[in-house]
């Protein structure tokens, strides 16, 4: 279980309140699919994923990215119980979708890059440390149901 200090929680909540979930979610998933092309196999029904511009402009990528980042908001609300907050998603990704749990770490790291891009100087090393801790905790929680 990940333990967050009061300062880390405050830091995460403060930045999360400024995140444009639709924009950042689409960018994060899009970047994941471009940088780690093997992850595209989970999105066969998304249509054209043939190039970076096709991926980043794909409405299904944007919509699913928003959905992913919206569910990440559950992590922000449930920092003290990440495993509980992500139990059903962990089961879905393990039993039905068969997603390699390593992909959760990759997406978390991409998300941190997107946040750094969006928030620039406001995304200090302390802010990054808090967010890295959160995305790592989410990746662990999502991998929890794997055998």
Curated annotation (Swiss-Prot):
The modification Phosphoserine is found at residues 14, 51. Residues 3-147 form the Globin domain. Signal peptide: none annotated. The keyword Metal-binding applies. PROSITE patterns: GLOBIN (PS01033). Red blood cells. One of its GO terms (molecular function) is oxygen binding. Heme b binds at residues 64, 93. InterPro entries: Globin, Globin-like_sf, Globin/Proto, Hemoglobin_b, Hemoglobin_oxygen_transport. The keyword Heme applies. One of its GO terms (biological process) is hydrogen peroxide catabolic process. Keywords: Heme, Iron, Metal-binding, Oxygen transport, Phosphoprotein, Transport. PANTHER family: HEMOGLOBIN FAMILY MEMBER, HEMOGLOBIN SUBUNIT EPSILON. Heterotetramer of two alpha chains and two epsilon chains in early embryonic hemoglobin Gower-2; two zeta chains and two epsilon chains in early embryonic hemoglobin Gower-1. Belongs to the globin family. The epsilon chain is a beta-type chain of early mammalian embryonic hemoglobin. This is Hemoglobin subunit epsilon. The gene is HBE1.
């Amino acid at each position: 279980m990940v333990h967050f200090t009061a300062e880390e929680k405050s830091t995460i909540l403060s930045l999360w309140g400024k995140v444009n979930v639709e924009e950042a979610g689409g960018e994060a998933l899009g970047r994941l699919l471009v940088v780690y092309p093997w992850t595209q196999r989970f999105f066969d029904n998304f249509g054209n994923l043939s190039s970076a511009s096709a991926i980043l402009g794909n409405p299904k990528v944007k919509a699913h990215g928003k959905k992913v980042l919206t569910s990440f908001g559950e992590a922000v609300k449930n920092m003290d119980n990440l495993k509980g907050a992500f139990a059903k998603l962990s089961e879905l990704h393990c039993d039905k979708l068969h997603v390699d749990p390593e992909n959760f770490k990759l997406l978390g790291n991409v998300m941190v890059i997107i946040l750094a891009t969006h928030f620039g100087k406001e995304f200090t090393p302390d802010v990054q440390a808090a967010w890295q801790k959160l995305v790592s905790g989410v990746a662990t929680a999502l991998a929890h149901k794997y055998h």
